[in-house]
Regions:
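Basic nucleic-acid-binding interfaces
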Residues: 1-153
């Protein structure tokens, strides 16, 4: 084949440190817009960014020229600086270590988009921990429940 054709859809999820509710609904769009800009600068295409006060979901078209851990590190580091430098939170903002990432086929993009778009409604009845366990189980990812949000000793 004379050219390279790639379409990889990824769904990233990561939490505020200690799952604190630091992303106010008032600042949410500003923070998500900054994240989208960062993704574009890194040559990825954000499709939707959503979440609630204690975590974020990102659906993107991923450019494999950048390693996933590097993408997440740059996104978290840049967003943390943006939030703290612009005093978008009352307290010092930090992301929790780690993240979850799931891949989806093109046929599932609309469903994942709607899922992320409806995070506020979705979390009226489900915690982030419940949501993440459900996603991990759905993808057959093995995990130790006690370490989902805490560091192994």
């Amino acid at each position: 084949m004379a050219n390279t054709y790639i379409r990889i859809y990824l769904h990233l999820v990561f939490a505020v440190k200690n799952r604190e509710a630091l992303i106010s609904p008032y600042r949410e769009k500003q923070i998500h817009s900054y994240m989208a800009g960062t993704l574009y600068q890194l040559n990825h295409k954000p499709i939707i960014i959503g979440g609630i006060e204690d975590h974020v979901h990102i659906l993107l078209s991923y450019n494999p020229n950048q390693a996933l851990p590097d993408l997440v590190k740059e996104l978290k580091t840049g967003t943390t600086k943006f939030i703290n430098n612009n005093r978008l939170c009352t307290f010092k903002f930090e992301w929790q270590r780690g993240y979850a990432c799931f891949s989806y086929s093109h046929s599932m993009v609309d469903k994942v988009y709607q899922y992320i778009e409806n995070q506020h409604e979705h979390h009226k009845g489900k915690t982030l921990q419940d949501e993440l366990k459900s996603m991990l189980d759905g993808f057959g990812v093995e995990y130790e429940e006690q370490y989902i949000f805490s560091e192994p000793e």
